């Protein structure tokens, strides 16, 4: 429990450090998108093959177990939302082992660790995702991870990574005298978007990785706390049973001694 709580503090601090970066990237790209021309449409917004899309899920599980129902809930959520022809790109050894040889949708050559997420790991994953989307290998890419709802609860969620949705990339209403209200995009909106869109996506993946890792440590701490309490209760019950058995044995021995002494006296 103490080790889990220590890891949770570090993971939570890392998540809190990452959140402002991701929020700023979302704000930045939301201020660029309205300046993009409607035609031609940027490939990152292109929705294709709508009737039967080639869909992939980037699934963030843990590298280790003993975290309660953390991994089971995530995989159950994935199976409930996925179609038979979808593909699973799984981060984390637990999810990989759970699906390997059991689910043909798993992409076995895709293997990444979930422990101690790094920005470089998120970049590598983003490059692979963008390449598969641009080449037409995939039509839709979703990320499935565990989102922290509050200090005590978390739950699996699914967010679309590609294609991007303009509806969710709109700038917040400008406040009175807001110095960020107007932006000048140099050389043009398309070029700026080409540069920041991949950064936004790997920030999105990195944010999900750090949040999932934090949720994993929280689930493991809760599981270890529950296991510790259960062990203490078991020890208490065993001590009571031992004391009762010991007391019964002592009582039996005393009874036998008294009975033997009485028999000796009667014989005399």
Give the ranges of each region predicted by the language model.
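C-terminal beta-strand-loop-alpha-helix "lid" module of Rossmann-like NAD(P)-dependent dehydrogenases
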Residues: 1-268
């Amino acid at each position: 429990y103490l080790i889990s709580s220590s890891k949770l503090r570090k993971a939570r601090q890392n998540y809190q450090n990452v959140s402002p970066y991701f929020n700023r990237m979302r704000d930045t790209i939301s201020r660029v998108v309205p300046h993009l021309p409607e035609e031609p449409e940027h490939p990152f917004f292109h929705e294709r093959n709508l009737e039967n899309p080639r869909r992939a899920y980037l699934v963030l599980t843990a590298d280790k177990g003993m975290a309660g129902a953390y991994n089971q809930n995530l995989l159950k959520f994935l199976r409930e939302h996925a179609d038979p022809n979808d593909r699973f790109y799984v981060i984390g050894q637990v999810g990989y082992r759970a699906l390997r040889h059991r689910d043909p949708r798993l992409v076995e050559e895709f293997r990444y660790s979930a422990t101690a997420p790094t920005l470089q790991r998120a970049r590598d994953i983003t490059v692979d995702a963008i390449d598969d989307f641009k080449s037409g290998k995939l039509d839709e890419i979703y990320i499935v991870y565990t989102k922290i709802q509050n200090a005590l609860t978390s739950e699996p969620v699914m967010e679309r990574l590609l294609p991007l949705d303009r509806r969710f990339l709109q700038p917040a209403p400008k406040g009175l005298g807001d110095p960020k209200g107007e932006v000048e995009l140099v050389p043009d909106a398309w070029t700026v978007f080409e540069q920041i869109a991949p950064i936004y996506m790997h920030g999105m993946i990195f944010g999900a990785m750090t949040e999932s890792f934090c949720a994993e440590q929280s689930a493991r701490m809760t599981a270890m706390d529950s296991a510790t309490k259960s062990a203490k209760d078991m020890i208490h019950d065993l001590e009571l049973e031992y004391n009762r058995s010991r007391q019964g044995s002592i009582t039996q021995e005393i009874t036998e001694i008294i009975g033997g002494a009485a028999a000796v006296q009667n014989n005399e």
